[in-house]
Amino acid sequence: MKELSVHVRQQTRALLHKILLKKWRRKRESLLEWSIPIIIGLHMGLFSYLARNIQVLEVPPQDLGSLNEFNGSSLVVVYTPISNITQQIMNKTTFAPTMKGTRIIGVPSIEDLDEVLLHNIPDALGVIFNDSFSYQLKVLRMYGNPFLKEDLLAHCWDTHSQAFCSLSKYWERGFVALQTAINAGIIEVTTNHSVMEELMSIDGINMKTLPFIPRDLSDYEIFILFCLLYFSSFIYFASSNVTKERKQCKEVMKVMGLQDSAFWLSWGLIYVGFIFIISIFIAIIITSTQIIMMTGFLVIFTLFFLYGLSLIAVTFLMAVLLQKAVLTNLIVLFFTLFWGCVGFTVLHKELPPSLEWVLSIFSPFAFTSGMAKVIFQDYNLNGVVFPDPSGESYVMIAVFFILAFDSLLYLVLALYFDKILLYGAEHRSAPLFFLNPTSCFRKTANRNKVIERDLDPELPSDEYFEPVDPEYQGKEAIRIRNIKKEYKGKSGKVKALKGLFLDIYESQITAILGHSGAGKSSLLNILSGLYVPTAGSVTVYNKNLSDMQDLKEIRKAIGVCPQHNVQFDALTVKENLTLFAKIKGILPQDVEQEVQQILSELDMQNIRDDLAEHLSEGQKRKLTFGIATVGDPQILLLDEPTVGLDPFSRQRIWGFLKERRADHVILFSTQFMDEADILADRKVLIANGALKCTGSSVFLKRKWGLGYHLSLFMDETCDSERLTSFINHHIPYAKLKAKTKEKLVYILPLERTSEFPEFFSDLDKYSGQGLMSYEVSMSTLNDVFLNLEGEPSTKQDFEKRETATDSESLNDMEVAYPSLSQVQETVSTMSLWRMQVCAIARLRILKLKRERKAFLIILLLLGIALLPLVIEYVANALLEVKNNWEFKTDLYFLSPGQLPQGLRTSLLVINNTESNIEDFLQSLKHQNIVLEVDDFENRNATNSLSYNGAIIVSGRQKDYRFSAVCNTKRLHCFPILMNVISNGILHMLNHTQYIRIKEDIFSPFIVLVWTGIQETCLFILCVICSLSPHIAMSSVSDYKKKADSQLWISGLYPSAYWCGQAVVDISLFSGMLLTSYFTSYTSKLLNIDMTSEIVFSVIVLALGCAASLVFLTYVISFVFGKRKKNSTLWSICFLLVIAITFEKVANGPFNEALVISATMLVPSFALNGLLVVLEMRAYQYYIEFEEIKHGLSAVDLLLCLIPYIHTLLFIFVLRCLELKYGKNVVRRDPIFRIAPQSLKAQPNPEEPIDEDENVQAERLRTSDALSTPNLDEKPVIIASCLHKEYAGQKKHCCSRRTRNMAVRNVSFCVNKGEILGLLGPDGAGKSSSIRMIAGITKPTAGQVELKRLSSAVGHQGDSRAEFGYCPQENGLWPNLTVKEHLELYAAVKGLRKEDAVVAISRLVNALKLHDQLNVQVQNLVAGATRKLCFVLSILGNSPVLILDEPSTGLDVSGKHQVWQAIQAVVKDNEKGVLLSTHDLAEAEALCDRAAIMVSGRLRCIGPIQHLKRKFGQDYVLELRVKDVSQEPLVHREILKLFPQAARQDRCFSLLTYKLPVTDVHPLSQAFHKLEAVKHGFDLEDYSLSQCTLDRVILELSKEQELGTVYEEADMTLGRKLLPPSDEL
């Protein structure tokens, strides 16, 4: 092991470097991340600069005149109830000078009063008497009276001709005049003393107004809303990256030594830097464009910076709690908007200070509160400076403190829940771990405590378990005792491991074998510390795996290669290795050397600078293995480390492990039995979670009666029965395994090798009796695995079961596949189109139904949309109270003993009488008002802005004259002062009662209530319209899963794909739109009378708007969806576009042409456009007091029609995109009118050189086949001169893009009834060739022709054929079951429902999928998933089958089932199969011919035996010695007996040689010599086999690795080629 020193600082620096590299290389993502806040900032600055920064200069005092000057002749005053007192009061009112000509009407009830008011708009006022001293005035909302306590933003307006202030409306519109007349009437009725002249002579005066910035309330709300969303892009990408990295890599990195603090520090520091920079930008924008004029840069920057930090912290917290990137984004967005909108109450000054500080625990609320305070100070032209004598600076310091506290709190909670919540690894801390650090994992440790009696359990029977060699006694490195593991499934607990007892030894390679789902990965995950066992214990070098401290020590010595690949796609191979080397704690000075050593030993030097995302699956697997071995860990836990690797790479890894066997513990799982046979010293076989047997290959093969495979090739003259009798005579226990017309295969027992010399000597003499040739090979562990899988009790049972299973499976498959052509009937083109539309619609419904996360996201977004509605209701409720409020003195004036607070001041009384006014002052004091009295000569009341109001008393005693002076910021000052004066006069007349007055603002229609939330219903629709990316971007996930390619190849029409999705998406979306419409209506937020015409127009428009937005989203998905789905980001973009459009339309004068233009240019504005027109028209009727016309105008109809024009346009655009950039269709699309295209053969850029003679012959045959007019003579697949180049990466921005050649002038064809195997190492071009043949990738040059099925649908004149395709990636939907997949593809391929049932049933029977039929794909084991993908490819009656590594990940029995299915396909001589595989045993078992590709070229082609004879005529000899010290002696003896023997692998106790045929033949002499060596040197065993196809491929693969074949094409072709694009 390397010396390790794990430091958080080193890990943090490494992770920071990784993040920066990712940001730099993902330039589009980074540009989007930075551009959104920059655009928001520039928009706010430009908006403010152009139109909104108009400062109102100082307004001098204004004399409004006396009340006598008001002319109320046009007024209609209605009062209730009618009584003697009320009639007297109202009669007195008529004597007021202002009331001359006023009609006064008495009605019995409030309802009657409302009705009279409605019929006398606009000059109607209502009076409701509660008693003789209490009444309320009911006025129309349009009357213009202020209805808020305080206008925070624009209390006065500069109209150029004169200044106008809001509070003057009370005086000028007659409200105060009527109030004063009624007060005078009450006083006269009560005291029989007339004060009408005295009160009506009161003058009204406005104090002077200081300069201020007038802004509409909505301006600041929109400004704050933009500020709240300013960091949205950073939050989006932070949550996405952190959540995905935690899910994919963090736990594996923790196994390798990663500290939690390093992980969070790296992401935290990078985004602290980002927030810092972007906060500087927005602070500069806000201050330089004077959005905020009086507050400095530092305050704005600090406020934004701390708010951004809090959002990053809450993002980390939500990422830990929710563990889903999209859900995290939406919750943070909801959190921001909700609490930010609640913070608007601070802007309205509706919350008590204590509650405001309590709610500041939510950072968006605290931020909105801080912005509101800045706005208040700016409004008063004070600004926030430090220090500030007024104390406002300390309030901002408190806001800064609470934001910093919020950030710290969220971060602490994130780290806490990261410790205690179960995610990824099952090890977690106790909830109160911070109280006692030693208590961490106590529960787990106790539960899995080592039980002494388990340390030495009763060993299983020796019949199944080979005894351990004495040399390994005492070297037990890992001791597993009674390990059990259970998982919670939907149907109950699933037992993965059932009481395993096992020891793993040092200096020994141990392989874990078993079928898919046997428990191999569960065991390895437990040993690595990722999983916690349900019961039992594990010790590693006497350290308990369940103890936290021991686990940390164990992990320092562990290297883990999980089943999934672990790498960072944005990093190169070298950078990945460097990163993990630093995480593991390798000393900085040793990192480079360690990385170079790994690159060299695993032969990755040629791909060291390639990005991981551009590697093939095999190369990614090799990189993951390299990461596991960094630091030379003493314990290697490898879960299928060589899956997907080519033979050469596999041999490299085998050699690597063999060299490190000494003093190391190597435990690996595999589905590749040959790998276990060759590499592992000891095999452990697990079945259904239980241990079946352990031992070496020799033990297992001997135990289960397996040995050599003798293959005899004969002609028609050979008597097979006589030959069998001959063999049984020499080898009595020989068994016939397989028999064909040309070949017999026997199994010769391993213990009979002593009889082989005589047997082969006699067999050589038998060759003249029809025996053409023979070959011998050693049995593999495949046979052992197949026998052990069924758990029979005896060897005889093994033989019977093996024969029965093979015959039954083959019979089932032979019945299943031909039946497909029998049940398929021709259907018409349109019938097939309808079937496909229904199938895709059902697929979309199933995806929506099963994806609970998607539904939760939509519901959450709906909640965000309805959030302002809730706030609107709350605001309306508050306004209902305020609109019915009483004009009390405590609104503006202090009471005796009350400390100055809020808006209240003392009442200033100016004495201008030159006498004592003590009687009046006493009357005021009896109203509980704090007075401040001064003389007129000393104090100018109009300049006393520190007071809310003042009363100037003039005249003489007992005949006072009054002037009411009001601060223009106190909107309700005049009614209050008039009541104060009236009550003062009443008290001076020796009456103790006080007059009380309330105001009730009456709305005659359902109108939008101004609450500070701009057009709530429009906001709802804006958010709903922005939801289309969350609804209609399903195609992006199909593309990511490669499911769309599979559907297209299966014959799906492009139009059926889009229309099938649209049927569901439009229905769902239109339902949401209509719901939001009618929710707004029923919430009484719309000024619209819902007549039948309007309801119809709304429904039509909603359907059209839903269709246009859905198809617009489809276009966006097609163009931009090939990288990431980004539905949340697109929703934000939609929302911003709608908001900006509405802002431009709504803030100007109403213009129908502008609305139409906006609707045409912005499809998502269509629904809002009609709403704006209808609302504004109704509002115009309202303010002009006209009768509402309910009909639809031409503009309304045009607005309803525009979305349908958009829909047709987007469908046409989608059709054009499919035609130009889409995949080539199999059938002619009846709707899009897209026909299969014959690609013109482009000239090949290079000519073939130094080709093998068989390759040249194949090229000529392919050329002749293309020109053959006879269709019956044509092969089923013709690939002529295929050439493919991909664009490489730029080394830097100024360099030219390189061209990488994947396939170089390859020609071959597949005949009817033939299986052609396409073989070669990783990067040889196999998959690229298959994708070109399948039509997924367009060839750079060359031509492909496939056989067409004459009875298939829609092929008249088509140049493309329908075929079955099994891609390398499983293009499946995780939430769909196996049965649903099969039914979907059956419909797409045109099978009628009843036929599909039959076909599916037979295929399920043949491939043993009964138990998985109703299981979702995400719950299937890897083997079952791969099997399903294969079944989908053979479903239907396709003449061509193209299979790209179809058996990858399958266990042995699964592979055999797939092989039998493929053989059944070609049993019909009209069909052909092209097969790509890394499993050379599969190629030998299935392929009639094999084509081997190396470096993009076809190296050789021909029958398997031909290739063996041509390239691999040698034999392989393996000898296993008991005593290692005898190796040199044995080696010399072998060289003496076989002079040309070449030693191959140098492995512990295993000698491997390659022997030429001349040294081996005759076999009788070879076996005679080997028997002598076996007995002379006491060998454990030996085997002699003819060179396999594996060896042939291995030798040819070296050409690619060594660079002897490939040439330079701007770069080394030995490097991995870029992954192919799906674009044609």
Swiss-Prot record:
Disulfide bonds: none
Pfam families for this protein: ABC2_membrane_3, ABC_tran, R1_ABCA1
PROSITE patterns hit by this protein: ABC_TRANSPORTER_2
Binding site for ATP 1: G514, H515, S516, G517, A518, G519, K520, S521
Tissue-wise expression: Widely expressed with higher expression in heart, lung, brain, spleen and testis.
Subcellular location: Golgi apparatus membrane
Superkingdom assignment: Eukaryota
GO cellular component: Golgi membrane; nucleoplasm; plasma membrane
First-level EC class: translocase
Membrane spanning residue stretches: 31-51, 222-242, 267-287, 297-317, 326-346, 356-376, 395-415, 854-874, 971-991, 1005-1025, 1058-1078, 1094-1114, 1130-1150, 1154-1174, 1194-1214
GO MF, one example: ATP hydrolysis activity
Topology with respect to the bilayer: Multi-pass membrane protein
EC number(s) reported in the record: 7.6.2.-
InterPro entries: AAA+_ATPase, ABC2_TM, ABC_transporter-like_ATP-bd, ABCA, P-loop_NTPase, R2_ABCA1-4-like
Keyword set, alphabetical order: ATP-binding, Glycoprotein, Golgi apparatus, Membrane, Nucleotide-binding, Repeat, Translocase, Transmembrane, Transmembrane helix, Transport
Binding residue positions for ATP 2: G1320, P1321, D1322, G1323, A1324, G1325, K1326, S1327
PANTHER family hit by this protein: ATP-BINDING CASSETTE SUB-FAMILY A MEMBER 6, ATP-BINDING CASSETTE TRANSPORTER SUBFAMILY A ABCA
Family classification: Belongs to the ABC transporter superfamily. ABCA family.
Function: Probable transporter which may play a role in macrophage lipid transport and homeostasis.
Name listed for the protein in its UniProt record: ATP-binding cassette sub-family A member 6
Organism ancestry: Eukaryota, Metazoa, Chordata, Craniata, Vertebrata
